[in-house]
Amino acid sequence: MLLHIPGLFDADELARIREALEQADWADGKATAGYQSAKAKHNLQLPEGHALAKEIGSALIDRLWKNPRFMSAALPHKVFPPLINCYREGGNFGFHIDNALRQPKGSPERVRTDLSSTLFLSDPDSYDGGELVIQDTYGEQQVKLAAGDLVLYPGTSLHKVNPVTRGVRYAAFFWTQSLVREDSQRALLFEMDNAIQQLTADVPEHPSLLQLTGTYHNLLRRWAEV
């Protein structure tokens, strides 16, 4: 399941973020890649724990925790702190699958990468190329969103970033360990939750709503890992 979550940052915030990123000291993106992924990774990245990355990441997570669509789809349990990357002309990241487990720097806890997220920070007209290409059950999906928009997709997906041929592509990315590890089960719960919310708006007093809501929570109780 691919999910588009729009408008997490406004134009003024994004302009300030990009101005700060233009002045930042970048490191080789291979530093946070696994052995196989490093062979395909050609980009720049703010070092893990960088003050600017922490500031952007904290604001992003705070907004997502208040976003009903994200919470319903991801059912988050743990999050790997967001990282920030930069693709300049020629930068790309070939097809790869993210490592199954991530351990934040300085933390004893590991995060299972059930879900991957990318927040686009550059206006799509400001660079050519740089599409996020995700392979799913419906074939290849090319994603190039407006600045401030996020895409959420299964961590099991084969994906790549096409070469940037003009301009600079800034983005934030992170991984979520869900309460429900199986994508098909999360998708079913997301659809059911959406249906419950729509029915609540349309027929708020319908007696079947109580039963349907109970079924949702019983499925979540069966599948959740805490």
UniProtKB/Swiss-Prot annotation:
Designated name of the protein: PKHD-type hydroxylase PputW619_4316
Record keyword Metal-binding present: yes
One GO BP annotation of this record: DNA damage response
Cofactor binding, note field: Binds 1 Fe(2+) ion per subunit.
Keywords for this protein: Dioxygenase, Iron, Metal-binding, Oxidoreductase, Vitamin C
Alphabetized SMART domains for the sequence: P4Hc (SM00702)
Domain Fe2OG dioxygenase: 78-178
